[in-house]
């Protein structure tokens, strides 16, 4: 259970970081 929760947290962190990077690249393109 704990390993599944930590794996889900890691996956969520990777998804958020990818989304932030994507938004950051789009903002750089707009400038």
Swiss-Prot record:
Q: Where in the cell is it found?
A: Plastid, Chloroplast thylakoid membrane
Q: Which UniProt keywords apply?
A: Chloroplast, Electron transport, Membrane, Photosynthesis, Plastid, Thylakoid, Transmembrane, Transmembrane helix, Transport
Query: What GO terms describe the biological role, i.e. biological process, of this protein?
Result: photosynthesis
Write out the GO cellular component annotations: chloroplast thylakoid membrane; cytochrome b6f complex
Q: Where mainly found?
A: plastid
Q: What are this entry's molecular-function GO terms?
A: electron transporter, transferring electrons within cytochrome b6/f complex of photosystem II activity
- The positions making up the signal sequence are none
Q: How does it sit in the membrane?
A: Single-pass membrane protein
Name a Pfam family for this protein: PetL
What transmembrane ranges does the database entry give? Answer: 4-24
The record's section on InterPro entries has: Cyt_b6/f_cplx_su6
Q: Which family does it belong to?
A: Belongs to the PetL family.
User: Which PANTHER family does the record match to this protein?
Assistant: CYTOCHROME B6-F COMPLEX SUBUNIT 6
What is its biological role? Component of the cytochrome b6-f complex, which mediates electron transfer between photosystem II (PSII) and photosystem I (PSI), cyclic electron flow around PSI, and state transitions. PetL is important for photoautotrophic growth as well as for electron transfer efficiency and stability of the cytochrome b6-f complex.
* Subunit relationships: The 4 large subunits of the cytochrome b6-f complex are cytochrome b6, subunit IV (17 kDa polypeptide, PetD), cytochrome f and the Rieske protein, while the 4 small subunits are PetG, PetL, PetM and PetN. The complex functions as a dimer.
Protein name (record): Cytochrome b6-f complex subunit 6
């Amino acid at each position: 259970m704990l390993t599944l929760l930590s794996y889900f947290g890691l996956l969520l962190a990777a998804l958020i970081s990818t989304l932030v990077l994507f938004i950051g690249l789009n903002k750089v393109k707009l400038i």
